[in-house]
From Swiss-Prot:
Binding site for [2Fe-2S] cluster: C328
Gene Ontology cellular component terms for the protein in this record: L-cysteine desulfurase complex
EC number(s) reported in the record: 2.8.1.7
Listed PANTHER family: CYSTEINE DESULFURASE, CYSTEINE DESULFURYLASE FAMILY MEMBER
Name listed for the protein in its UniProt record: Cysteine desulfurase IscS
Known role: Master enzyme that delivers sulfur to a number of partners involved in Fe-S cluster assembly, tRNA modification or cofactor biosynthesis. Catalyzes the removal of elemental sulfur atoms from cysteine to produce alanine. Functions as a sulfur delivery protein for Fe-S cluster synthesis onto IscU, an Fe-S scaffold assembly protein, as well as other S acceptor proteins.
Pathway: Cofactor biosynthesis; iron-sulfur cluster biosynthesis
Naturally occurring in which organism (per UniProt): Clostridium botulinum (strain Kyoto / Type A2)
Molecular function terms, GO-annotated: 2 iron, 2 sulfur cluster binding; cysteine desulfurase activity; metal ion binding; pyridoxal phosphate binding
Organism lineage: Bacteria, Bacillati, Bacillota, Clostridia, Eubacteriales
SUPFAM superfamilies referenced in this protein's UniProt entry, alphabetically: PLP-dependent transferases
Cofactor(s) essential for the protein: pyridoxal 5'-phosphate
UniProt-annotated binding residues for pyridoxal 5'-phosphate: G72, S73, N152, Q180, S200, A201, H202, T238
Length: 397
């Protein structure tokens, strides 16, 4: 296996050299606890403050509205549990969608066991939630609406501004999981009426294990982690200075590079989509067909008569790394909840492949995938009873 092509940037990214360079002194030289009062900790305090400033600038938020966490999952947990527990006297109803990340869905299911009511809204065949459906689901008990900014599997960019306006009008808190959106979509929490927003550094070329939750001033929220008085009394635990510095630098670079990077990724995405559709019969592009409403790095196809896990292994043997819509990492054989939610039959959802592009991908990478993938699909279909049945049924029709 000579050539290696990584196309799973929605799962994680590498840490950019400029980010690592800024982080390194905080492991060995400037290691003071940012909460300590002596002058030795001044550099760490300043570094954490600078990172907070960089994040707030990227979102058009205030500095004191940014709270650092251990990642996107913690931020999502904090947003849902924190709002639910702090506002239960006002109401006990939460609205979300069926295609959220498991950090939202599993937290919502946990809250249901705690006595909260959760409405899981459907989406259309491209993954869009209807603002009208949200409006119709709101009751006197509704305290929170949580809708992801952009979907991690099929790249759908949701109508966040319209949802924000509705929530403001109804006086309901609005949270968005923006883990996939940072660096790809313009975000303005004021203009979009967002009350809470989650992010994770490792999705935009920062380190793993650090994220942030934006909490608009005045939002009533309970702490998730209790202990010391860090993060202005809202989130206990000694600050991960190096990680926070990395997040701050990474988001600054993501904002600077966004127009150029998005153009490059959109062009590569177009080349890949057109190439697959031209070379492989009976394929279905999952997610929005209008590319302006889709993440610029997202490609997700279903291949009739193919098992996703087998396809991944075949690609791996050829040095291509992507992901599947199947829950191959768990004991479950159920396909992706996202693909089922957009109406795909089980067997179609099982044969799905997500290729998510990033900074190091080139046209040569795309062409290599277009050389290898059709051969694998052809070979696997020749051995597939699913494909045989499908073609037989098609001929009969």
């Amino acid at each position: 296996m000579n050539k290696q092509v990584y196309m799973d940037y929605s799962a994680t990214t590498y840490t950019k050299p400029e980010v690592l360079e800024e982080m390194l002194p905080f492991f060995t030289e400037n290691f003071g606890n940012p909460s300590s009062l002596y002058s030795f900790s001044d550099k760490t305090k300043k570094a954490v403050n600078l990172a907070r400033e960089r994040v707030s600038k990227a979102l058009n938020a205030e500095k004191n509205e940014i709270f650092f966490t251990s990642g996107g999952s913690e931020a999502d947990n904090w947003a849902l549990k924190g709002i639910a527990y702090a506002n239960k006297k006002k109401g006990n109803h939460i609205i979300t969608t069926k295609i959220e990340h498991h950090a939202i869905l599993h937290t919502a299911q946990f809250l249901e066991k705690e006595g909260f009511k959760v409405t899981y809204l459907p989406v259309d065949e491209e993954g869009f939630v209807s603002v009208e459906d949200i409006k119709n689901a709101i009751t006197d008990e509704t305290i929170l609406v949580s809708v992801m900014f952009a979907n991690n599997e099929i790249g759908t960019i949701e109508p966040i501004k319209e949802i924000g306006e509705l929530c403001k009008e109804k006086n309901i808190y609005f949270h968005t999981d923006a883990v996939q959106a940072i660096g790809h979509v313009d975000i303005d929490v004021k203009d979009m009426n967002i009350d809470l927003l989650s992010m994770s550094a490792h999705k935009f070329y920062g380190p793993k294990g650090v994220g942030a939750l934006y909490i608009k001033n005045g939002v009533k929220i309970q702490n998730l982690i209790h202990g010391g008085g860090q993060e202005r009394g809202k989130r206990a635990s000694t600050e991960d200075t190096a990680g926070i510095v990395g997040l701050g630098k990474a988001i600054e670079l993501a904002m600077e590079n966004m127009p150029e990077e998005n153009e490059k990724l959109s062009n590569l995405r177009g080349r890949l989509i057109r190439g697959i559709e031209a070379r492989i019969p009976e394929v279905k592009l999952n997610g929005p067909k209008d590319m302006s409403r889709r993440l610029p790095n997202n490609v997700n196809f279903s291949f009739i008569g193919i098992e996703g896990e087998t396809l991944l292994l075949d690609l791996d043997m050829n040095g291509i790394f992507g992901s599947t819509g199947s829950a191959c990492a768990s004991a479950s054989l159920d396909p992706s909840h996202v693909l089922l939610s957009i109406g795909l039959p089980h067997e179609t959802a099982h044969g799905s492949l997500r290729l998510s592009l990033g900074a190091k991908n080139t046209e040569e990478d795309i062409d290599y995938v277009l050389e290898v993938l059709p051969k694998i699909i052809k070979q696997r279909r020749e051995m597939s009873p699913l494909w045989e049945d499908y073609m037989k049924n098609k001929e009969e029709k």
